[in-house]
């Protein structure tokens, strides 16, 4: 089964999204990856974000980011 891919930028992890990565990694239905740079420096500077199946998902806080990731997945099922 193909799992949704959640990608994090290491620079954004240092800015606070590390907690979101750790929460999402606990979900066995997700593939969570960490990369050196995803090339979204402007968005990265603004606050917590992740790529969800290639689409930018942001949150004002870590909790909001996690909720927005799950909301995005609910609204955009893979199958």
UniProtKB/Swiss-Prot annotation:
It comes from Bacillus cereus (strain G9842). Belongs to the UPF0349 family. It comes from the Bacteria. This is UPF0349 protein BCG9842_B0165. Signal peptide: none annotated. InterPro entries: DUF1450, UPF0349.
């Amino acid at each position: 089964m193909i799992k949704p891919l959640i990608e994090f930028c290491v620079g954004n992890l240092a800015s606070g999204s590390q907690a979101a990565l750790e929460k999402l990694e606990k979900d066995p239905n997700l593939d969570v990856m960490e990369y050196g740079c995803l090339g979204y420096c402007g968005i990265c500077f603004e606050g917590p974000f992740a790529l969800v199946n290639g689409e930018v998902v942001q949150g004002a806080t870590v909790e909001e980011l996690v909720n927005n990731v799950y909301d995005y997945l609910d609204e955009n099922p893979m199958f």
